[in-house]
């Protein structure tokens, strides 16, 4: 699949963000970066869709947008119950949503179901002018692909994607093979999307952002943390960690996907050769695990993984420079 990646800084397409806001705090940092980049380069954020059942994630999205000085865009959420909604997925977003989102507190935050969300935005978008960025699981997109014509659009979900979406950038998978959270948390949805998706998929795999540290460790005053939704997110998420000398920092898994989507190939990142992604890949040392993936070289493959060109510390500094504007 031949495709020339056009970053948002040069071709300001409309963006839809799909996030699992809650299980990890780097979704907060990724959203901050996306908002800041949108201000800089003038591309619209059409909407943000929460792929979990965690309603506090919606309030957190609203809180982050308002803290960063922008109106909260059209919101969507997975309609199912019990997905990524256990206590471990509520370390920070309950507090952030309750404290900083008035609409969440008073029950007026409007959120569409995931199919209505995607079909509405894509039906009204210009052809080939949408970039979808995913920093969570793929259940929302699986639902979109299987959706049928309705009052919103005479096109199927697959036809809408083919017509409206230029490419997808995702934080997912690991090279050369292995298990990664955004895939194994809903393996069948990821498999369906990756096998059926009709556009190129650019991947920031686990190892790209793992050791790139970013966040709010420059804020340690408890009073400031309690008044700052971004610092609260990072500090509440990391406060029980014993391996951090200073709380408030986390890996940048999702932030690197955002950074690549906007900046593209250049000093910081390059692209590897296309591959196919094999599901149900066997890991010799762990034969009991059936939900791994493996990258298989394929010149016609639609999966293109990112590669870092600079040290992790350099990327972390550039991301922190954005986060700490707010």
Regions found by a protein language model. Give the residues of each.
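Intrinsically disordered, low-complexity boundary segments flanking structured domains
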Residues: 61-64, 154-158, 245, 290-292
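Active-site histidine-anchored catalytic micro-motif
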Residues: 3-59, 104-211, 216
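Metal-dependent C-N hydrolase catalytic cores
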Residues: 1-12, 17, 56-125, 306-311, ...
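Conformational coupling and interaction surfaces
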Residues: 2-13, 33-44, 184-195, 199-326
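Short, mixed-charge aromatic SLiMs
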Residues: 54-62, 166-170, 174-176, 276-298
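Residues in well-ordered beta-strands of folded domains
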Residues: 76, 169, 259
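Charged, glycine/proline-rich intrinsically disordered loops and linkers
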Residues: 89-100, 150-154, 283-294
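Short, surface-exposed amphipathic charged segments that create phosphate/polyanion-binding patches used
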Residues: 87-98, 180-185, 218-220
């Amino acid at each position: 699949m031949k495709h020339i990646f056009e970053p948002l800084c040069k071709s300001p397409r409309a963006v839809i963000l799909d996030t699992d806001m809650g299980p990890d705090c780097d979704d907060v940092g990724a959203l901050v970066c996306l908002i800041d980049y949108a201000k800089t380069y003038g591309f619209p954020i059409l909407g943000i869709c929460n792929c979990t059942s965690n309603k506090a994630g919606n309030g957190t999205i609203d809180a982050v947008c308002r803290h960063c000085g922008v109106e909260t865009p059209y919101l969507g959420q997975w309609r199912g119950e019990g997905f990524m909604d256990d206590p471990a997925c509520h370390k920070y977003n309950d507090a952030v949503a309750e404290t900083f989102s008035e609409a969440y507190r008073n029950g007026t935050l409007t959120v569409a179901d995931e199919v209505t969300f995607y079909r509405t935005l894509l039906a009204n978008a210009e052809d080939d002018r949408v970039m979808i960025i995913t920093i969570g699981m793929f259940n929302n997109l699986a639902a979109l692909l299987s959706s049928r014509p309705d009052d919103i659009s005479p096109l199927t979900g697959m036809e809408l994607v083919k017509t409206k979406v230029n490419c997808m950038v995702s934080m997912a998978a690991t090279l050369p093979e292995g298990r990664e959270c955004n895939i194994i948390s809903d393996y069948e949805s990821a498999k369906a999307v990756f096998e059926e998706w009709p556009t190129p998929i650019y991947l920031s795999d686990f190892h790209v952002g793992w050791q790139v540290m970013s966040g709010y460790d420059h804020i340690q005053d408890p009073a400031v943390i309690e008044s700052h939704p971004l610092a609260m997110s990072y500090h509440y998420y990391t406060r029980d960690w014993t391996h951090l000398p200073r709380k408030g920092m986390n890996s940048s898994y999702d932030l690197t996907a955002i950074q690549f989507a906007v900046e593209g190939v250049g000093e910081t990142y390059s692209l590897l050769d296309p591959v196919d992604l094999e599901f149900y890949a066997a890991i010799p040392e762990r034969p009991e695990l059936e939900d791994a993936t493996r990258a298989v070289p394929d010149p016609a493959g639609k999966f293109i993984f990112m590669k870092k060109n600079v040290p992790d510390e350099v990327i972390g500094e550039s991301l922190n420079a954005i986060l700490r504007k707010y």
